[in-house]
Amino acid sequence: MNYTSFIFAFQLCIILCSSGYYCQAMFFKEIEELKGYFNASNPDVADGGSLFVDILKNWKEESDKTIIQSQIVSFYLKMFENLKDDDQRIQRSMDTIKEDMLDKLLNTSSSKRDDFLKLIQIPVNDLQVQRKAINELFKVMNDLSPRSNLRKRKRSQNLFRGRRASK
């Protein structure tokens, strides 16, 4: 195991416990299992500061925080995917934590979960994928734009005012 893996396991423990959810005994046991496997309790793990906790502290609004959390969860899912292990206990611990992270992030919505997993599996180095992504870029950028929501809000406000004025 390398130093980076140790840090990741330690950060996972911190994120799961500090994200506003209560640590259940089952998940605590699984996290302890991973900490032991990665030797994440070693004092040198703290060298260089935290990976994610300080970033999470910077974001106060729930919607903004959810965006950051989705990136962090994506990171852990990829890390666990790369750490396929023959040790059944460790693999079970990683699978249990993956399930819980996704459930908490996506509020146990199976369709959101499927879409999230589909998105993180898209290979970014594939030329065909890149071509499709560029082709869809304008639509994605429009969807990200707050103007479309502002226009809808203004229209609904004008309709409401019009009804009120006619009474």
UniProtKB/Swiss-Prot annotation:
Cellular compartment(s): Secreted
InterPro entries given in the database record: 4_helix_cytokine-like_core, Interferon_gamma
Gene3D superfamilies from the UniProt entry: 1.20.1250.10
Record-level GO BP terms: adaptive immune response; astrocyte activation; cell surface receptor signaling pathway via STAT; defense response to virus; extrinsic apoptotic signaling pathway; Fc-gamma receptor signaling pathway involved in phagocytosis; humoral immune response; macrophage activation involved in immune response
Residue numbers bearing the Pyrrolidone carboxylic acid modification: Q24
Entry keyword set: Antiviral defense, Cytokine, Glycoprotein, Growth regulation, Pyrrolidone carboxylic acid, Secreted, Signal
GO CC field: extracellular space
Tissue expression remark: Released primarily from activated T lymphocytes.
Pfam families noted in UniProt: IFN-gamma
GO molecular function ontology, one term from the record: cytokine activity
Assigned protein family: Belongs to the type II (or gamma) interferon family.
Record's subunit section: Homodimer. Interacts with IFNGR1 (via extracellular domain); this interaction promotes IFNGR1 dimerization.
Biological function: Type II interferon produced by immune cells such as T-cells and NK cells that plays crucial roles in antimicrobial, antiviral, and antitumor responses by activating effector immune cells and enhancing antigen presentation. Primarily signals through the JAK-STAT pathway after interaction with its receptor IFNGR1 to affect gene regulation. Upon IFNG binding, IFNGR1 intracellular domain opens out to allow association of downstream signaling components JAK2, JAK1 and STAT1, leading to STAT1 activation, nuclear translocation and transcription of IFNG-regulated genes.
Descriptive protein name: Interferon gamma
Taxon lineage: Eukaryota, Metazoa, Chordata, Craniata, Vertebrata
Gene assigned in the entry: IFNG
